[in-house]
Amino acid sequence: MPPKSRSTGPKKTQKARRRDKKNVPHGAAHIKSTFNNTIVSITDPAGNVISWASSGHVGFKGSRKSTPFAAQLAAENAARKAQEHGVKKVDVFVKGPGSGRETAIRSLQAAGLEVGTISDVTPQPHNGCRPPKRRRV
């Protein structure tokens, strides 16, 4: 009896997805700045993500992800990708207590996007979950 081959059939080659060029002149930039990372997503008015970047995605690891400089590079990266899709003006929604909030907004402006309104949408608990205990250093 011949040995069974472990082949599961023909190899499936992964096809590169073609990214459609959207033409969206006005969008929204959502900046989520936590104590560990900063995530910048640029969406169309319906909320569909056009481009995104984060401090970790840009190349920072560990505690360097939470720095303002990492947030600046992430925002510039997301803005550059969004401008390829025709985004010129954004409304900014900032969420979270992190250190990269203001830096990310400034770098969106420096990258060439016109910033309309800036809104803080940080969720506030109405006495919900118990917060983490205080650090003892």
Swiss-Prot record:
Query: Spans of biased composition, class Polar residues?
Result: 1-11
Basic residues composition bias: residue spans: 12-21
Keywords (A to Z) from UniProt: Ribonucleoprotein, Ribosomal protein, RNA-binding, rRNA-binding
Determine if rRNA-binding is one of this entry's keywords: yes
Cellular component terms, GO, for this chain's entry? ribonucleoprotein complex; ribosome
Q: What does the entry give for GO biological process?
A: translation
Whether rRNA-binding counts among this entry's keywords is yes
In the record, the note on similarity to other proteins reads: Belongs to the universal ribosomal protein uS11 family.
PANTHER family reported for this sequence: 40S RIBOSOMAL PROTEIN S14/30S RIBOSOMAL PROTEIN S11
HAMAP family found in the cross-reference section? Ribosomal_uS11
Quaternary structure, per UniProt, is: Part of the 30S ribosomal subunit. Interacts with proteins S7 and S18. Binds to IF-3.
* Protein name as it appears in the record: Small ribosomal subunit protein uS11
